[in-house]
Amino acid sequence: KSKYLILVFNNHLYCVIHLGMSGTLHFMGLKKKTTNLSFYGSQSLPKKHNHIIFRFKNFKLIYNDPRRFGFFKILDNKKDYLKFFTRIGPEAISKDFNKIYLSKILKNRTKNIKNLLLDQKLVSGLGNIYVNEILYQAKVNPFKKSHLIELNEIKRIVKYSKIILNKAINFGGSSIRDFKGITGKSGNFQSEFKVYDREEKRCSRYNCSGLIRRKIISN
């Protein structure tokens, strides 16, 4: 759900996992020295930054995270599990994220549209890369105040959120630095970027010869 992984155990415990920016999960046989059973291929298990190990009957699950932005949260009942996700907005790829919902959350908010879309309490599953790409395709200024966004702009934001996220999934994600998908392969959506990481390059929009400039919206 959103950017979280959920493990449900037979004893009614729930484990909510967020991999942060650099976390990976490795599956290994109990007597194996390499991660041949890992989603990340037949590479050796990293020697550093292995923070959590779950031992099961026939294998172990290892959480590795060099930057340590991720977390594991154990919840001991369904009520707490459901409560955890009430603090998270609908996924941008879902039917619940539509023009009616977006219009409602934009109303009376003075935060700029980019920061609003990054707020996981309002919309979940969007990060910096995809918000940049969505607003570019929707032709919406990222600095524009949320309450000033017009209906036709709202429709385009919803439309391109779904188009871009689905396309990114089909391309295996965006491999920036060390990101890999569950097959162990790097994603390819970075080859489709229109604005992210394209500073000083030509705009790819038809009939536009401008250069892409980088501007900081917030720290």
Q: What residues fall within each predicted segment?
A:
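Active-site beta-strand-loop-beta-strand hairpin of nuclease catalytic cores
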Residues: N10-L13
